[in-house]
């Protein structure tokens, strides 16, 4: 016969477990451990066995449980047991389980009453149990026997405390009825770890072995030595019953008959016995499950909310709906167009704070990278002067010219304009790369439909490539237009007269320092990369770039200036990235081979990314610091020709040089303005319009709709998993709601005055016998409950001593007298209120037993009373 209450809980817990396992999680109910604590031969193992409903633990007289037994009950469809020390063997006969426990105990402790703290781990799989842990502990003893060590008492207590200290442990404090309750070590230990008494249940065993005429009624009614959760009396099988193979069913029937027939217990028979103990423990398990439900519910609700948004699109999913694929295709294409436009035009909705979007990158190309590429093709001064001198001489031919020729200016300008084609085409290529990258990022949302994604990328990329050709043609046309007519009447053009005076004005301007406010072009952190380790190694500084100088400071407060470097004769060159470095480096050097900083001919400045390097280079260009040119030509001849010019030719070269500078600046300004406009119109805006208006038609013509909208296996699995998870979460929440409504929590009993457990050191000499207490407790309960119970009770016992004090004493005079003095204020231990509660059926022979006990009372108790009162 199993534990019916526990079997009723099994479906409830299984529902929860199934609900959680369906969402791929485990339901951690963490049901309480049930630990049985008590003295030797108190009946601990029998109590535990009755709770499980199986006969499998060793029992007998003396110390039988000599190692802790950790019994794990695990719900399973088949019934068997296995030990941790021999996992490979499954026990289906529980007699063999008992024999294995005895054998394993002897293997570690020997056969001569030895004790070991090493636990035996037993797992019992059964369809009739919950997932619980039960602990059978060795009995508390004070005197070592056999192979037991001298400190056996402390060893056992430490062992017990390890198991019952856990907050979720229920403690069954087992005390036999024929022993002293006030000195119960089990209750004392429980009080240490559970001072509020919330998880301690008193269990009184061996009620059938009490002396005739004595009972434990007041203890079981929680009037004498009360506990918060009270006491439950049980009657276990005797050793004779066990040897006679009396099963648990018959034992429970005999127990019930005992309580119904006993005059002291029949009125509370429904609150006594193993079934009531099972019911009480099962109610504690129910309470624990209910207490766990709010945490589980909030956990499930948070998961459900996180899934709501993702599941919203799947809720109305109908695989057999003929319009489903059409709707999905339209929705996907529209979403792709919206995402593409947001990434290009920018949007305040869901801004990416980790990296630049496509539109921001294209903006950087237009206004940082492209101007930098234009300045990079800046002509070399010596080469330009040589070309101008050759042009002037070739135009004059054999004649000696008196005036500066216009044709030389036009020839040089046209040659410079042609050089603009390369940076302009490179700008288009950079924009195309960003557009294609943006398309791929936007199609990532189409990953559910691989064929649709592939076709969308192909069609849009093909269109961008088509627009690339037209855009490049248009840009080349712009350059050809600039080359076709040199407009020397432009309002920004300096003209011949101004060109001749420009050199003088520039020299004067350089001689007079700028008294106005210096314009700061850029600020930021840079690392000087080539300072030797001997001088501190590479270090990060705060750099400030103006139109005249480059300064660096210790930090961004700009209070402690480290150095200021004038920009005259400075240029930029690229530096290869170090093998072990993740920094991107460029260098600044002096064209006149002078040191730029201390003993360094160049300073290497490091940034975290190539984009930062390009941005700094563009800033240096604005300040007039240009990139280094490759000197592929023979400079010796150039120098000879340059320096061999006569003064008149030199003046003409200088004039044309200034005119070329002025006109090329006008063209650069125009190209810098027209390039972004041309690319935006011919490429970006056209691509957006194509996606919005024509992409869908191209998709329909490129492939069958069914093949386009075939889901990937991963996406179908993901959708199914998400929907299953969503419904499982809702089902689990419904189950939790059902459990909450179908079960009832038992309220915690109110606190009781259990100071007797704390004062047992002073009471311990007196109370020796609980059975007797049940005979004369009516006068004693007030003594325990009230703060000053003694005085009012003194007169009552005096009158009652002769007539009602004897019945409990005859069987064990000594212990009875000691127990009678549990109340230090009552000189005579018996209270006269008992007669009214004694059933009329008390045997007439009881009075004859009273006389022997009376003489022993003064001898044992009276000498101890004064010290107790003190």
From Swiss-Prot:
One of its GO terms (molecular function) is microtubule binding. Residues 741-870 are annotated as: Disordered. The modification Phosphothreonine is found at residue 755. Residues 38-45 are annotated as: G1 motif. Changing residue 399 to A: Does not Affect stimulation of GTPase activity by CTTN. It catalyses: GTP + H2O = GDP + phosphate + H(+). Gene3D superfamilies: Dynamin, middle domain, P-loop containing nucleotide triphosphate hydrolases, Pleckstrin-homology domain (PH domain)/Phosphotyrosine-binding domain (PTB). One of its GO terms (biological process) is ventricular septum development. Its EC number is 3.6.5.5. Residues 653-744 form the GED domain. Residues 205-208 are annotated as: G4 motif. Residues 235-238 are annotated as: G5 motif. Residues 519-625 form the PH domain. It holds the Pfam family Dynamin_M. Residues 756-767 have a biased composition (Polar residues). Residues 64-66 are annotated as: G2 motif. The modification N6-acetyllysine is found at residues 299, 598. Oligomerizes into a helical polymer that self-assembles around the vesicle membrane, when associated to the menbrane through lipid binding. Interacts with SHANK1 and SHANK2. Interacts with SNX9. Interacts (via C-terminal proline-rich domain (PRD)) with SNX18 (via SH3 domain); this interaction regulates ATG9A and ATG16L1 trafficking from recycling endosomes to sites of autophagosome formation. Interacts with SNX33 (via SH3 domain). Interacts with PSTPIP1 (via SH3 domain). Interacts with CTNND2. This is Dynamin-2. It comes from Rattus norvegicus.
């Amino acid at each position: 016969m199993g534990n019916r209450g526990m079997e009723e809980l099994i479906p409830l817990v299984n529902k929860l477990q199934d609900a959680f396992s369906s969402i791929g999680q485990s339901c951690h109910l963490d049901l309480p451990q049930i630990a049985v604590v008590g003295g030797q031969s108190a009946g601990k193992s029998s109590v535990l066995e009755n709770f499980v409903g199986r006969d499998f633990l060793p029992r007998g007289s003396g110390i039988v449980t000599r190692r802790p037994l950790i019994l794990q009950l695990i719900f399973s469809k088949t019934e068997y047991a296995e030990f941790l020390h021999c996992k490979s063997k499954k026990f289906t006969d529980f007699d063999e389980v008992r024999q294995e426990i005895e054998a394993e105990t002897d293997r570690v402790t020997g056969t001569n009453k030895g004790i070991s703290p090493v636990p035996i781990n037993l797992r019992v799989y059964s369809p009739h149990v919950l997932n619980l842990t039960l602990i059978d502990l060795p009995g508390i003893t004070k005197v070592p026997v056999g192979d037991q060590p001298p400190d056996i008492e402390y060893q056992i207590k430490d062992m017990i405390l390890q198991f019952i200290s856990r907050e979720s442990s229920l403690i069954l404090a087992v005390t036999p009825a024929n022993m002293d309750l006030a000195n119960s070590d089990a209750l004392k230990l429980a009080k240490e770890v559970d001072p509020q008494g919330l998880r301690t249940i008193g269990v009184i065993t061996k009620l059938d072995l009490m002396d005739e005429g004595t009972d434990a009624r007041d203890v079981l009614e929680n009037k004498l030595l009360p506990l918060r959760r009270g006491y439950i009396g049980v009657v276990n099988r005797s050793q004779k019953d066990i040897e006679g193979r009396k099963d648990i069913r018959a034992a429970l029937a005999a127990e019930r008959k005992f309580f119904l027939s006993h005059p002291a217990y029949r009125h509370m028979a429904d609150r006594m016995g193993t079934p009531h103990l099972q019911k009480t423990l099962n109610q504690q398990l129910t309470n624990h499950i209910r207490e766990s439900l709010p945490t589980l519910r909030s956990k499930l609700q948070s998961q459900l909310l996180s899934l709501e948004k993702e599941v919203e699109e799947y809720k109305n999913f109908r695989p057999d709906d003929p319009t489903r694929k059409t709707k999905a295709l339209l929705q996907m294409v529209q979403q792709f167009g919206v995402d593409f436009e947001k990434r290009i035009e920018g949007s305040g909705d869901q801004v990416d704070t980790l990296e630049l979007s496509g539109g921001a990158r294209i903006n950087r190309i237009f206004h940082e990278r492209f101007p930098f590429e234009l300045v990079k093709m800046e002509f070399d001064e010596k080469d330009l002067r040589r070309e101008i001198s050759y042009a002037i001489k070739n135009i004059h031919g054999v004649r000696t010219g008196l005036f500066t020729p216009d044709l030389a200016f036009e020839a040089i300008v046209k040659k410079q304009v042609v050089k603009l084609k390369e940076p302009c085409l490179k700008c288009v290529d950079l924009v195309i790369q960003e557009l294609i990258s943006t398309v791929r990022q936007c199609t990532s949302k189409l990953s559910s439909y691989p064929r649709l994604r592939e076709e969308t990328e192909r069609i849009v990329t093909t269109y961008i490539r088509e627009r690339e050709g037209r855009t490049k043609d248009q840009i080349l046309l712009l350059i050809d237009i600039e080359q076709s007519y040199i407009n020397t009447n432009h309002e920004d053009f300096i003209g011949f007269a101004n060109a001749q005076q420009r050199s003088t004005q520039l020299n004067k301007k350089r001689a007079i320092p700028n008294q106005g406010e210096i314009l700061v072009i850029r600020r930021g952190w840079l690392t000087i990369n080539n300072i030797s380790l001997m001088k501190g190694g590479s270090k990060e500084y705060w750099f400030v770039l103006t139109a005249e100088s480059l300064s660096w400071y210790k930090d961004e407060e700009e209070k402690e200036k480290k150095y200021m470097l004038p920009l005259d004769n400075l240029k930029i060159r690229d530096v290869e990235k170090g093998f072990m470095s993740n920094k991107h480096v460029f260098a600044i050097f002096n064209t006149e081979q002078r040191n730029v900083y201390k003993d360094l001919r160049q300073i290497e400045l490091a940034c975290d990314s190539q984009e930062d390097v390009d941005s700094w280079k563009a800033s240096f260009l604005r300040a007039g610091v240009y990139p280094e040119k490759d000197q592929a030509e023979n400079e010796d001849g150039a120098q000879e020709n340059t320096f061999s010019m006569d003064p008149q030719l030199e003046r003409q070269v200088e004039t044309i040089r200034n005119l070329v500078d002025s006109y090329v600046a006008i063209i650069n300004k125009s190209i810098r303005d027209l390039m972004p406009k041309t690319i935006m119109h011919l490429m970006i805006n056209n691509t957006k319009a194509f996606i919005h208006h024509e992409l869908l038609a191209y998709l329909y013509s490129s492939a069958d709709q069914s093949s386009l909208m075939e889901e990937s296996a991963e996406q179908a699995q993901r959708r199914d998993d998400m929907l299953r998870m969503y419904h499982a979460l809702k089902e689990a929440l419904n189950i939790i709601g059902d459990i909450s409504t179908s079960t009832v929590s038992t309220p915690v009993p109110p606190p009781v005055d259990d100071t007797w457990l704390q004062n047992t050191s002073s009471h311990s000499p007196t109370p020796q016998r609980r059975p007797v207490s049940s005979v004369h407790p009516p006068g004693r309960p007030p003594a325990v409950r009230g703060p000053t119970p003694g005085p009012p009770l003194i007169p009552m016992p005096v009158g009652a001593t002769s007539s009602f004090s004897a019945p409990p004493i005859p069987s064990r005079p000594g212990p009875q007298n000691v127990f009678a003095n549990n109340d230090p204020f009552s000189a005579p231990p018996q209270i006269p209120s008992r007669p009214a509660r004694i059933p009329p059926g008390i045997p007439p022979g009881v009075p004859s037993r009273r006389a022997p006990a009376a003489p022993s009372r003064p001898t044992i108790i009276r000498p101890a009373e004064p010290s107790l009162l003190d």
